[in-house]
Amino acid sequence: DLMGETYDASLMPDRLHPSSIGAGRMAMHLCHYLEPTTEKANPCTFAIPGNEYRSAAGWKEGADWHAVSEEITQILSRKKLDILFLGNFITQGFGGSRELVTYKPGKAAVDSCFKDLTWESAGISGDRTENLLWRLRHGKYGTSKPAYAVITIGINNVNAGHRAADIAEGICAVVEETRKQMPETQILLMGLLPAGLEKTSPMRMKCDSIHSILQCKTWGDVVYVNPTSWFVQA
């Protein structure tokens, strides 16, 4: 404990040097001091690569965010898909054919449900909207020409302390970039999975606020799904 507060070892494992998560937290807070004062920038829409490197992210030892991102790009450049899953750790857990991903708890279920379809997971552990936005712009995912793209992103922005309105704007930016890169693809946007044990927990309330914003959007041919009821008992 530090002055009565519980020490968060995920941020500074050796109590001196920040982890990738801690470095991201530092950068986010520094941004508030260094950004122009005339207009507050939205970090959720500013496309940047990720900074994760830990094997605990479900990757082979020695792999980092850039290696994992490049593997996705290479895989998608070689195949045409029926379904492309875009997202973070939840989507990464579907597995697909990626060799750098060692933890694939959802692969058997996805294989069973979509056994007659060609699909791939482009999820990366720890990714926020701004990281997926960067990958969409630089990874040339559109070469796989998926019939469907399923997007699940934003919970790590909640964890990072971003505002609900900013997160919703970041999610919308991801949808629009997907439309731009894959104009013939049908997009299914799956909203945030519920977080927090209680309805009144700050994380749950922020997720609900994001759902409320997204549900009011005019999506056109994009299908928006709120999965909260799949996991939460009334």
What role is predicted for each listed range?
Residues 2-16, 20-86, 90-112:
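N-terminal secretory targeting modules
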Residues 1-40, 104-118, 127-130, 134-234:
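Alpha-helical cap/lid subdomain in secreted, periplasmic
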Residues 83-85, 119-121, 224:
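Conserved beta-strand scaffold positions in the cores of enzyme catalytic domains, especially
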